[in-house]
């Protein structure tokens, strides 16, 4: 299924926010990926707004970033 422009913009904003949070926590892509057992490339693609993450992926990110 194709993603429209508004959805793409939302994914890009989400990715930017995740990247900002990761950097504020002082984590590299590799460190975050290791802590949540995900591939660093998948997190990179998420931060670039190139993928639509599942709910469980977002839960894992919240745990890895220590977000309540």
Regions found by a protein language model. Name each.
Residues 37-51:
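Recognition helix of helix-turn-helix/homeodomain-like DNA-binding domains
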Residues 2-24:
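A short, Lys/Arg-rich alpha-helix, primarily the initiator
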Residues 16-35, 60:
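Short basic helix-loop element that most often maps to the first helix and adjoining turn
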Residues 50-63:
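Short, basic-rich loop-to-helix N-cap that marks the start of a DNA-contacting helix
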